[in-house]
Amino acid sequence: MTPRQSSSITKIIRASTILIALFSLAGCLQTQVSTPLALPSPTVGLASPSPTLPPTPTTEATLPPEPSPQPSPIATQNPLPPATMITDIAGHVQTYELGCEASAAVDWAGYYDVLIYESTFQFELPLSDNPELGFVGNVTTDGWGQIPPHAYGVHAPPIAELLREYSLPAVAVKDMTIEDVKAELAEGDPIIAWVIGNMVYSSPIKIYDKEGNAVVVAPYEHVVILVGYDETTITYMNNGFFYSVPTEVFLTSWSVLGNMAVIYD
């Protein structure tokens, strides 16, 4: 081998060595590029807590508490005045000794502007042996102060019934109280009251009529018109004149025939 050939072979070997080195380097670079770097996985944070929801309102309505039952108001009557007097009533002296009931009845009717003659009213009353049913006695001839079957007079029911025929709202009552009397008078309504004589006492007597009906009577039965009161007295009209007596005196006399009266109702 010539020196020139040897030199050529040496160059070829060097060139091959360089190429091999270059290929090796290129392979390393390719390996580094193709293998991705292991990146750290992203840290998964803790889930944020869900926002707290407000409580769902209940659908059931809250009812207000029931009010406590209150007592019903009690109707109160107006207090009675301490005194009153009916002054615009006129009276007259009775025509017949035994005719006090008819005399008082027509005076009472006149107060309500109803004109009735005493004699007319008297003879329109039915006759009976029972004063609860009609007039007992002969008004033109008999005297006062007896009891049935003798001449006597008449009680409240026949008087009220006849007054109603004159379109007056007359009502016969018994067992009235002094408060009832004051209430009527305070309303401006006079009262026909059955008493004994001039506000005296007499013993009540039970009798029986021909039909066997019992009735309480008293000697000297009399009728007046009550027109006023104050704290201690009752005022009444008798034969057109006015008188005042202690309330207790009136009540004693009035009680004999059971607190009997005719009122405007």
Predicted regions and their residues:
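N-terminal secretory signal peptides that target proteins for export/translocation
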Residues: 1-9
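Active-site-adjacent structural segments surrounding the nucleophilic cysteine of cysteine proteases
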Residues: 28-158, 197-199, 204-208, 214-217, ...
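Mid-length scaffold segments of soluble, non-membrane domains
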Residues: 146-179, 184-186
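A mature extracytoplasmic/lumenal domain signature
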Residues: 104, 174-177, 195-199, 228-230, ...
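Structural recognition of the beta-strand scaffold that forms the well-ordered cores
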Residues: 99, 171-173, 191-195, 225, ...
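Bacterial N-terminal signal peptides
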Residues: 16-26
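Noncatalytic regulatory segments and standalone regulatory/sensor domains
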Residues: 148, 201, 205-218, 223-265
